[in-house]
Structures are given as structure tokens and as C-alpha cells.
């Protein structure tokens, strides 16, 4: 009897542990509360058997009471409820585990329901140690090989070294959840134990969407090795593309300008000029201006250098002029001095100084939005825009012609002033000529027409009337005392009227009369000509 009891006590732990080892595994069994209960029962089985064996020894034998009729009814009840007559444990003590625990798991534990959808769960407590070794050891191997074929072979070897059941359960802890998730997705198993990012991956069941959103590409490419290898090989492709995309954008506006500013500020300029060049870019707000500026960024440094060299060449000539030329305002009223060492210009207003500094730096912050042309002054930009719009607000007061700039109108009015000056000069030159002309034609008018008028009527009445003989013979007798002439004149008048009557042209008679009376004309008209002259 004692030997039989000892055999039962020795066999019962083995038979109790065997059902746990050979219990059929299924996806519904893979849940943490059931695993905890099974582990507790497997650890507490000897104590349970010891507690069950003491009543057998003290109160009576279950087998002897049934076979040989010994006492100890209480012991027989306990023995019959726990074990079969053949010494095998009955299934009644575990029926409540197989029914109640499954219902509780299905209703309460959502994590278990999420993870039951993955059939390939190959991790228990021993595989956790293996996965830790695997994640730490193959880092150099993955560094040597960029492809995951040898790693798959390592994984298959480690899995074959472990227990064959694929749907077994793991330890009841967050680490177990992380290991199970790692076994489900090999990319996560590589990264969980390697560094301190295990909480991120252990939270995969509770936060499924962040893992799918944040680590979709690293999972597929971080599988060859640990997180260090994933950072070494696959991820540089992404930062490289980002860096290649960002680098051409930033230097287009900032880095070349800063270098140009340093090169400009080193020879003979103050350091704050570089700051102005840096602040030049935010004013170019439109995208088109940014593109235009990016295309011109390479040649802009050369332009700036050329402007500095030109300013250096121009400055000495100004240096020779300014000390000799007095300024309109005294120096104490011009507190803003040019910071360039080779320039001694001073200004009474800060905006004038700012405008002047742009000459040294070559800065043109005002840009036309239509043609993208840059200007150093805002008023220049305003007048330039009028060339595009066609606006001409300045009109000439004399001719009404319109202009887009006031200086153009001034230049045009000077043309009118010159024309006025020319007209005035012409009038001054014409007035002496007119006076000289009035002096010369008066003798002609008095000398020639007056004899004609006097000569024409005088012969006509003399020709028709008889006093012709009396008029002419008297001067003839006085001027020519010879009687022959008087006789001739006396004889001529009788013939003269006949000619006049036949030919009414007074011109002929006048010509003859003037020829005959030339001495009288000179005597009568000589004083008149003297008076006019």
C-alpha cells in the first residue's frame, strides 16, 4: 500500500505536468490571463498534491477504502474527486479553467483578441532570450551584408532550436507582448531589444495606427539588422533626398548672399552692410521674383564686387572735389556720415544716408513686379512703372504735351524758352533793318514819283491850253537869253497840241517836258531831298 501511495505521489506530478506540455494549442488558447493561470497551476501542483496526500495518510486510503473496505470516508471523497481509480488525474478540477477563463478573456481582454489574429506566434519565455541575442549579435553581420537572406537563415535556425509549436503562448507581461509582436512582425523584433525604443514598439497592439503611419517604410527596410543598421543604410536615402531638396533652396537666397556680404565687407566697408544685404531678400515676396533671384544668384556676387570696385575707383575723384566745394549746410547740421572709410559724405537725414549707402553696396531692393527690374530708389521704381501703365501726369503749360516724369517736362519747357529767346533775337535784329529800310525808300519815293506826278499834269494842261507858250518861254528866256531858243519854243507848242490830240499818251509829252525842264526840277526839288536826308 505504501509503495502504491508513493507511486501515485510520484506519478501524479508527472501526469499533471504532461497535460500542460501536451495540451493542444489553438489560437483561442493564446491569451495572457489563461497563461497566467496555467503557470500558477504548474508551479503550485506539488503543493496541491502534498495537501491532497496528507488526508490520505491520516484519514484513510482512497484506494484501500474502495478496494479493501478501509475507513476514512473524507479521504476517499477527496481522492475520488481528484484522481481516477487508475491513479490518473480527473478532468473535473480543470473544467472551470477551460470554460470560465475563455469567457472572461473573450469579453474583457481586447489585447488578446487583437493578437489572436496572428497565427505565427513562436515565442515563450526561452525565445525572449534568443531574440535578445539575435538582435544584438547580427549587427556586424548586417553591416557586412545589406540583404536579409542570411538573417532569414539565422531566424530559421533560432526558431528550429526553440520548441516546435508555433501557436504557443508567452509570458504574462508587457515584455511578453513586445516579444509576441516582435515574433509577429520580424522588423519589430529586430528593433525592440536593441535600444530604448522598446516602449514605442511594445505599444503596437494598443496604438496600431501610429505604427502603421510612422514606421511603414522603416519596418520594411530596418529588417536586415538592428536599428543602428537601419539608420546606417536605408534611411540615408530619405535624408539624402530631403537634403538635396532643401540645399538648393536655401543657398539660392541666403548662403551666397552671406558669402558675398563677407567678401564685400572685408576690404573697406563696415560690417552692418552685410546685414542690409541679408535683409534684402525678404522684400522679394512673389514666387516669380524668388525664381528670378535664384537664377541670378550666381552672377549677383560678381555684380556686387564690380560695384564695389567701381565705387573704389570713383571715390578718389569725389574725394578731390568735395573738400574744395563748400556745402549748402554746415557740417554740424549734417550728423549722418557715410560709414565707408574712403567716402566723406555727410547727410542731414537718415534716409538720405541709406540711399547713399546703396551706391556703395549696389543694393536694389525695389523691384518692378512686371519686368522684374530692380531699382535702388522707390521714386525710380514709381516712374518706371509708368512706362508700363502709360500714365503721364505731367503736362506742358505751353503746348500741352504730357510726360511721365517731371524732369522730362522741365527739359521740354527749356525747348520753349530757347524758342522764345531765338524769336526775341530775331526781332531785335529785324528792328534796325526796318529803320534802315525806311530811310532809303523815302528819297526814292520823293525823287521819282513826285516828278512823275508833277510832270504829267503840267504838260497836259500846257498841251491843251495856250499858256504853254507862256510857261516855257519864260524860263527859256531867263535861262537862255538867246532869241533863237524862244522862237523855237514858240514854234514847238503849236505842233505839240496836235500830237497830243492825235496821241493821248501823256508819257511821251511828260518825257519831253522833263527833259526840257530838267534844270527847273533840280532847282525846285533839291531842298526837299536835303531835308529828308
Curated annotation (Swiss-Prot):
Q: Which GO terms describe its biological process?
A: BMP signaling pathway; cellular response to gamma radiation; cellular response to heparin; cellular response to interleukin-8; cellular response to mycophenolic acid; circadian regulation of gene expression; circadian temperature homeostasis; estrous cycle
State a GO cellular component annotated for this protein.
nucleus
- Family under the similarity heading: Belongs to the EGR C2H2-type zinc-finger protein family.
Give, as residue ranges, the zinc fingers classified C2H2-type. 336-360, 366-388, 394-416
* Residue ranges, compositional bias (Gly residues): 68-77
The Basic residues compositionally biased stretches are 411-421
Which named protein is this? Early growth response protein 1
Q: What is known of its domains?
A: Binds to DNA motifs with the sequence 5'-GCG(T/G)GGGCG-3' via its C2H2-type zinc fingers. The first, most N-terminal zinc finger binds to the 3'-GCG motif, the middle zinc finger interacts with the central TGG motif, and the C-terminal zinc finger binds to the 5'-GCG motif. Binds double-stranded target DNA, irrespective of the cytosine methylation status. Has reduced affinity for target DNA where the cytosines have been oxidized to 5-hydroxymethylcytosine. Does not bind target DNA where the cytosines have been oxidized to 5-formylcytosine or 5-carboxylcytosine.
* Induction comment: By growth factors. Up-regulated in lung vasculature in response to reperfusion after ischemia. Up-regulated in liver in response to partial hepatectomy.
- Pfam families the UniProt entry points to: DUF3432, DUF3446, zf-C2H2
Stretch list, region Disordered: 1-94, 161-237, 316-336, 407-478
Q: What is the deletion mutant like?
A: Mice appear grossly normal, but females are anestrous and infertile with an uterus weight that is roughly 30% of that of wild-type. Ovaries contain normal numbers of follicles, but lack corpora lutea. Serum progesterone levels are strongly reduced; estradiol levels are normal. The level of luteinizing hormone (LHB) in the pituitary is strongly reduced in males and not detectable in females. Responses to ischemia and hypoxia are blunted, leading to reduced tissue damage in response to ischemia and increased survival.
Sequence ranges of Low complexity compositional bias: 164-189, 427-475
Name the tissues where it is expressed.
Detected in lung vasculature and in mononuclear phagocytes. Detected in liver (at protein level). Expressed in the liver in a circadian manner.
Q: Where is this cross-link: Glycyl lysine isopeptide (Lys-Gly) (interchain with G-Cter in SUMO2)?
A: 303
Q: Where is this site: Interaction with DNA?
A: 334, 345, 349, 355, 373, 377, 401, 405, 411
Identify the coding gene: Egr1
Matching SUPFAM superfamilies: beta-beta-alpha zinc fingers (SSF57667)
